[in-house]
């Protein structure tokens, strides 16, 4: 039976709730009970328990049988390892990150947007120096964070009024005002890369470029990006510009791989 576009977009409630539960457990940083999960996610407790039992059976969560509490399970580690080893984008991006890290002496990352409001680090390369900025694979951030956020906002080309609320929820060490941030987004749209000089994290410069792909019916968008991270005192002038241009051209090359269809 062929499904309509509307039916394909409609989420399967049970699957959606299972994903919500996994995300909640991942963010809790401690084992939690059924009732706490049910209250937090507004799920009927008996339904929540059935989902947790199923996830536990498949190793996606782990139950403390004595305390009757749940946490993420070991199967997710295997999934993560398999994803890093087999995902087409991660493989293609890793070589790019390794080269840029070596050439420009910076830590490099590739991120993938998770849903509409978060990004997750899916690949990285460390700077070949005694001191470098450390980033973990699997780290999650708000989608509009730092220079990478400038790129995603620029690619989405959304109304500024729509962007104001998520912007105000961001955590900055040296926060820009909204108009200045919009100027940074416009810069990213016009130049193909973005720069955050110590706003998100004081003393740290982040340079990023979006990877554009066909997201729906041939319409271009961006759910992935690459970036370089270094100390602001070291990453400036010609070195900063060289990194920006390298990220821009590398992102463009990766974009060509994903411009025709989703991968």
Question: Where are the regions that the model predicts?
Answer:
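A structural signal for short hydrophobic beta-strand segments in well-ordered beta-sheet cores
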Residues: 61-63, 110-111, 211
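Short, structured helix-loop boundary elements
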Residues: 11-15, 69, 73, 86, ...
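Cysteine/selenocysteine-centered motifs that mediate thiol-based redox chemistry or coordinate metal-sulfur cofactors
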Residues: 163-166, 170, 251-263
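A short beta-turn/loop motif at secondary-structure boundaries
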Residues: 64, 113-114, 198-203
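Extended hydrophobic
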Residues: 173-252, 257
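N-terminal helix-turn-helix
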Residues: 1-86, 90, 252-260
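Amphipathic alpha-helical effector-binding/dimerization core
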Residues: 67-166
């Amino acid at each position: 039976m062929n499904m309509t576009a509307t039916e394909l977009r409609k989420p399967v409630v049970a699957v959606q709730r299972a994903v919500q539960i996994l995300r909640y457990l991942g963010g809790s940083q401690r084992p939690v009970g059924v009732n706490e999960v049910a209250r937090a996610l507004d799920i009927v407790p008996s339904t929540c328990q059935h989902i947790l039992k199923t996830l536990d059976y498949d190793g996606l969560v782990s139950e403390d049988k004595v305390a009757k509490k749940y946490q993420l399970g070991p199967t997710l580690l295997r999934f993560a390892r398999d994803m890093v080893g087999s995902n087409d984008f991660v493989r293609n991006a890793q070589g790019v990150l390794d080269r840029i890290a070596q050439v420009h002496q910076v830590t490099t990352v590739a991120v993938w947007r998770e849903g509409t409001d978060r990004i997750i680090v899916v690949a990285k390369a460390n700077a070949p120096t005694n001191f470098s900025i450390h980033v973990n694979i699997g780290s999650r951030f708000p989608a509009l964070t730092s220079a990478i956020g400038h790129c995603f906002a620029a690619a989405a080309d959304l109304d500024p009024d729509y962007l104001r609320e998520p912007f105000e929820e961001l955590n900055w060490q040296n926060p820009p005002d909204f108009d200045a941030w919009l100027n940074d987004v416009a810069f990213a749209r016009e130049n193909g890369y973005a720069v955050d000089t110590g706003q998100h994290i004081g003393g740290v410069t982040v340079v990023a470029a979006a990877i554009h792909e066909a997201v729906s019916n041939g319409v271009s968008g961006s759910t992935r990006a690459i970036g370089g991270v270094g100390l602001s005192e070291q990453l400036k002038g010609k070195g900063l510009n060289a990194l920006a241009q390298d990220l821009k051209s590398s992102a463009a090359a990766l974009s060509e791989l994903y411009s025709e269809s989703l991968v």
